[in-house]
């Protein structure tokens, strides 16, 4: 059975490394560990045609982000200015933090 764990979390700044949105940066809005997918702000925007369900809720054309596979995104380091690999280290107080493998800054 596959492990249901992602390398990015909700709120992380990521960069897309492949596909039609390659190079775009955005925050992770939602993560789906069981599917291995994430929704990134401003990435993989699709057009939905919604039908009016009630008079209070009008229909129309709506643009929204669709999930992309988590393997297509990489954690973004503000210090390096690019997508980076990360490591995990334990601080003196016992707290686990992720750090950039390139510049050793805490992410």
From Swiss-Prot:
One Gene Ontology biological process: translation
Entry-linked SUPFAM superfamilies: Translation proteins SH3-like domain (SSF50104)
Superkingdom of this entry's organism? Bacteria
- GO MF: rRNA binding; structural constituent of ribosome
An example GO CC term for this entry is: ribonucleoprotein complex
Is Ribosomal protein found in the keyword set?
Answer: yes
Q: Which UniProt keywords apply?
A: Ribonucleoprotein, Ribosomal protein, RNA-binding, rRNA-binding
Q: Which residue ranges run through the membrane?
A: none
PANTHER family named in the record: MITOCHONDRIAL RIBOSOMAL PROTEIN L24
Describe the function of this protein: One of two assembly initiator proteins, it binds directly to the 5'-end of the 23S rRNA, where it nucleates assembly of the 50S subunit. One of the proteins that surrounds the polypeptide exit tunnel on the outside of the subunit.
Family to which this protein belongs = Belongs to the universal ribosomal protein uL24 family.
Q: How does it assemble?
A: Part of the 50S ribosomal subunit.
Mind telling me what this protein is named?
Answer: Large ribosomal subunit protein uL24
The gene is rplX
């Amino acid at each position: 059975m596959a492990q249901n764990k992602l390398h990015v979390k909700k709120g992380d700044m990521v960069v897309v490394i492949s596909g039609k949105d390659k190079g775009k940066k955005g925050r992770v809005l939602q993560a789906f560990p069981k599917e291995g997918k994430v929704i990134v702000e401003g990435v993989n925007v699709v057009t939905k045609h919604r039908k009016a369900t009630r008079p209070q809720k009008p229909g129309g054309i709506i643009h929204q982000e669709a999930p992309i596979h988590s393997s297509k995104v990489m954690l973004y380091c503000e210090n390096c200015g690019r997508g980076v690999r990360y490591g995990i280290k334990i601080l003196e107080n016992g707290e686990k933090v992720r750090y950039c493998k390139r510049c050793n800054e805490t992410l």
